[in-house]
Amino acid sequence: MTTPFRYLVRVRYQECDAQHVVFNARYGDYIDLACFEFLRAALPSPRDVFDGTFEIQTVRQVVEWKAPARFDDVLEISVWANRIGTTSFTLCFELRRAGEGALLVTSETVYVHVDPKSFSKREIEPRMRAALETGARGKTTDHAGYLA
């Protein structure tokens, strides 16, 4: 596989629990942020994410925890499309500490494309399908200041 899209985010104090590790529910937040940045980088126009052109809802999310992340770690989240159907698609996520190889968390998340008013399923247009297939390969969004 070519280099997937990467999103870098720093773990903040309020995202950690009494065990001094990232609270388990926060991984869903990181995945949601990475999905948004992936779509912003991959879709034909960044506005497609904001203007209702490509409205999505999460319908299934499986998260597998392998090791803890801690306060001030920089998480490197790799994102790619695994399957693209008629109205839904699956994104895969791998979370690691930036610069390290060991997996902390993996996720497969299924999204359905919906009409922004009725929330009924909507077919994924060919140009959006092509954008998901290409997937912003090789691009990185750094909200941690890690690469600066």
Residue ranges and their predicted role:
Residues 1-76, 82-148:
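Terminal targeting signals and extreme-terminal segments of soluble enzymes
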